[in-house]
Amino acid sequence: MAYFRLYAVLLAVASSVAAVKVNPLPAPRHISWGHSGPKPLSDVSLRTERDTDDSILTNAWNRAWETIVSLEWVPAGIEAPIPEFDEFPTSTPSASAAATRSKRANVPIQFVDVDVEDWDADLQHGVDESYTLDAKAGSDAIDITAKTVWGALHAFTTLQQLVISDGNGGLILEQPVHIKDAPLYPYRGLMVDTGRNFISVRKLHEQLDGMALSKLNVLHWHLDDTQSWPVHIDAYPEMTKDAYSARETYSHDDLRNVVAYARARGIRVIPEIDMPAHSASGWQQVDPDIVACANSWWSNDNWPLHTAVQPNPGQLDIINPKTYEVVQDVYEELSSIFTDDWFHVGGDEIQPNCYNFSTYVTEWFQEDPSRTYNDLMQHWVDKAVPIFRSVSDSRRLVMWEDVVLNTEHADDVPTDIVMQSWNNGLENINKLTERGYDVIVSSADFMYLDCGRGGYVTNDDRYNEQTNPDPDTPSFNYGGIGGSWCGPYKTWQRIYNYDFTLNLTNAQAKHVIGATAPLWSEQVDDVNISNLFWPRAAALAELVWSGNRDAKGNKRTTLFTQRILNFREYLLANGVMAATVVPKYCLQHPHACDLNYDQTVLH
């Protein structure tokens, strides 16, 4: 009986995909294939009802078509049943059907006809990204309809994965196809950190290329941190004295370049200046008095005295009035460069001991002994948030959840500020949505892409352990996290299987606007950034675009396997240096590397 149930599941899968080799990622919300046979493509031209010369749409189509032609893509990972079963039924038609196919195949696709309803919709949060794509039997055109240009761009990236080589120097769509598609969540992002280590503009472009192909639409750019300040500020050019070198800086032109490159691919860039914690470099060059504890020992070895969770310490002085003058100047200058309505202003990991080094803060506490660190955080919110809102009526702020949920928190944080949740998984998502905050999910236990690679702090005596102290219990060097605070490593399966709205009410679930996978860069630079983002970020991309469940509500992780393995090869073909995730044997032998023989084990 178990054998029959498993075979039935696989047969259902086989019947849905047997006709085609392609397996686009993220999987469209709805896709249906015809049966009349391959549709050849000639030199396909873009047609619209509007003059689109030099527009985002025209340029996007030109890139897509150039990619299609130059790659002559052949899918590398094809879905098939677990090896013990017979091969999938072939899509070979009867003789009469073959004759019909041959006749229809004589009409090559020559055009992509795009109908956009709202050409002027800006690339901001909540913009409509839906599209339909139709390639009908006997038609010489692919029809794309979209509410906005941004939806049409997604149609192009889907089409790129559908058109493949015919093996004889030509290009084909394997069958007529109809797609109706739209994202589950409006916010689908990656976070890059250029404060711990510098990332070149070239490598930022590479990440944006991968994001566009997988329909991720937000680059959260954590610009700086205590370790370095790489961003040129006209108002305070001395801030880049705390860049790692003159070469490792971003000019205004560099910032605009990244914003423009992203926008051309339907991706928003949301900058983050992390404040008031994680703030030494740059700020201290303007005035050392606006930074507390910058010259203290971070004191992990004597934790009760610690001033930071990692080297080096430094937090903006919340009580010093000049702090807010400098913050306003820096914030307004960067707001003029980054065009998105949203801006991330940090708010995480305040360390109370740091303010023992501030005369301003210690005197403030002495003035009123009833004051607490919660009052200090509220002072920051009350003084800083009006500055952050002042640049635009459409400005919306994002903060890390600590400002609300940390031991040291502000008691009154406006609920129109978006909270990015990184700690305690479902528990914190529940707390935030219950209070009415919109939430970006970045749970470290599922989505932190830097985790599980050991520690980086040096002179660490914990590694000096020659024998296993307790073979029955995992420890630091024996089966434990080995210095990575958020270990283990987050595999694509860990990311894809995250049900981050689990147990939320419908009202709470509506407050979850999407997710971002952060890659903190303590151990990341140009050499390995793409390997650490990709292809794992593609698991997040499908999770927030079309979900991890099928129409019956069952987890579809086993069906996603070949899709992500194939997509890794597609990323490489497009110049995105994605990491190896399996022996190539697994790619070429679908499900032969599964842990569980039962393909329904995740349902």
Swiss-Prot record:
GO terms for biological process: chitobiose catabolic process; glycosaminoglycan metabolic process; polysaccharide catabolic process. Its EC number is 3.2.1.52. The active site is at D225 (charge relay system), H278 (charge relay system), E349 (charge relay system). This enzyme can be produced in large-scale and may be used for the enzymatic synthesis of complex type sugar chains containing GlcNAc and GalNAc as components. Disruption phenotype: Normal growth rate, cellular morphology and efficiency of conidial formation when grown on easily metabolizable carbon sources YG (complex) or MM-glucose (complete) media. Grows poorly on a medium with chitobiose as a sole carbon source. Low level of beta-N-acetylglucosaminidase activity. The record marks W485 as: Essential for chitooligosaccharide substrate binding. Part of the binary chitinolytic system. Involved in hydrolysis of chitobiose and higher chito-oligomers (produced from cell wall chitin by endochitinases), thus contributing to the formation of germ tubes, fruit-bodies and septa during hyphenation. Hydrolyzes synthetic substrates p-nitrophenyl-beta-N-acetyl-glucosamine (pNP-beta-GlcNAc), p-nitrophenyl-beta-N-acetyl-galactosamine (pNP-beta-GalNAc) and 5-bromo-4-chloro-3-indoyl-beta-D-N-glucosaminide (X-GlcNAc). This is Beta-hexosaminidase. The gene is nagA.
